[in-house]
Amino acid sequence: MIRVGIIGGGQLGRMLALAGYPLGLRFRFLDPSPDAPVADLGELIVGAYDDPDALARFAEGLDVVTYEFENVPAHVARALERQVPVYPPPAALDVAQDRLSEKTFFNALGIPTPRYVAVDDRAGLDAAVAELGLPAVLKTRREGYDGKGQAILRDAADLDAAWQTLGGRPLILEAFVPYDRELAILAARGRDGSVAVWPVVEIEQVGGMLHRAFVPARSVDDILAATARGYVEIAMAELDYVGVLAIELFQVGDALLVNEMAPRVHNSGHWTIEGARTSQFENHLRAILGYPLGETDALGAIGLQNLIGEMPDPSAILAIPDAHLHHYGKAPRPGRKLGHITVRAADEVTRDERLAGVDAAACLASGRGSSSNLTR
């Protein structure tokens, strides 16, 4: 019996386990919370990610270790690597955990990003604004996700408030990008260097969190798709990567700029569970175990919507043809990802109609107005 260890017990770990059980895998998780969403899916070691005793109990007898979020301390991953193979490699954490390191990594590979300046103090912020101009986005270099740890600077009056909120730690100022839309590209790379890439995803974000995703992304020509594919393949090769890697992109005209990367399975790839021949979760497991990678083509026109704060009535969702509900087993809380819904259709028009129905049900549950703008 192959035993897989997953650092982190959230919904990504849960979906990895659900993809792995048909392969005959067994799972052990490390998470600080006894109520983590994975609690009923395998052995759960409750402890801090840097607790030596918890780590020792976690690592014992495992065949491979992976992680479901990128803020695992890199030194912890390296320590585990002395006992058991760890994928993706800890070097990927070094890059992804620091926004400055991430930008310099891509630029060194010839891959464009928004312009940026490191900010270490208040005077440095003024100098960075003078160099990049306004508007701009001030971000913490470490941690921060789903729109957290950042502030938009629209004019000089915003600087003091942003510094009061974010100052006192390493920051980065990024030039504001007037992008046409946001895209994502996900790929899996095996131990043998083989690569499988899913179709380009169009994503819509609300408040810094992914709200909806569409596959195929509309009007993506072969050149644009090849550019996105090239970015992820170059990054994977440089890191000798194993597992799934996601890269979020800004499209500006015919150009693609890298916004950020995630060295793990990713929200923009949840559609692959029902919408691709092989899901990101299964291919991640195949990759880290040295199995052949599965095919990644989409099974029609696919849409995804996140469920934030409140869960809708399952009956309302499941009445929509080819709609698939995923509940993460988390207690409702404002701003919290509780689940997602994937819809499939033979064409984009039908897909968008079904996704509008999903949105209406989700809005009814949350008490907000419809967010649908699906005249795409």
Regions found by a protein language model. Give the residues of each.
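ATP-binding N-terminal substructure of ATP-dependent carboxylate-amine bond-forming enzymes
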Residues: 1-104, 123, 359
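Active-site nucleotide/adenylate-binding loops and adjacent lid/helix of ATP-dependent enzymes
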Residues: 95-184, 188-235, 357
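Short, low-complexity Ser/Thr-rich regulatory SLiMs
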Residues: 187-191, 249-253, 329
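Protein kinase-like catalytic core scaffold
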Residues: 196-199, 245, 256-260
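Short, flexible active-site loops
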Residues: 208-218, 260-273
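Active-site "cap" helix and flanking loop/linker of ATP-utilizing ligase/carboxylase catalytic domains
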Residues: 226-247, 252-253, 262-310
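Peripheral (often C-terminal) accessory segments that flank ATP-dependent C-N-forming ligase machineries
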Residues: 286-376
